[in-house]
């Protein structure tokens, strides 16, 4: 292990990670969803974002179910709904923050 941890960081991440209004959950497991969404919402609030998109995919809806469970409990969420067909349809959820 190197003494300088910056050497272990890929070049594209050395400038920081850009936070956007979209979270893509492809490749994640349902048990990871609560922490990911809570962090995503906190970052969005810090940036003053009011509308977010969470992409969970169309598959078996396991991720979508977990996403909706977390959003229902969040004190920061005003409402959420399926994205328009142009934005992913039922494979993505739009979130409006308070």
Residue ranges: model-predicted function:
Residues 1-98:
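Long, charged, low-complexity intrinsically disordered regions
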């Amino acid at each position: 292990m190197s003494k300088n941890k910056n050497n272990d960081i890929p070049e594209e991440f050395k400038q920081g990670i850009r936070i956007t209004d979209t979270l893509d959950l492809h490749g994640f497991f349902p048990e990871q969803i609560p922490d990911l969404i809570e962090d995503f919402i906190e970052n969005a609030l810090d940036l003053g974002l009011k509308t977010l998109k969470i992409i969970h995919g169309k598959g078996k809806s396991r991720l979508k179910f977990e996403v909706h469970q977390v959003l229902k409990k969040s004190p920061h969420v005003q409402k959420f709904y399926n994205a328009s067909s142009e934005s992913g349809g039922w494979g993505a959820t739009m979130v409006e923050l308070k």
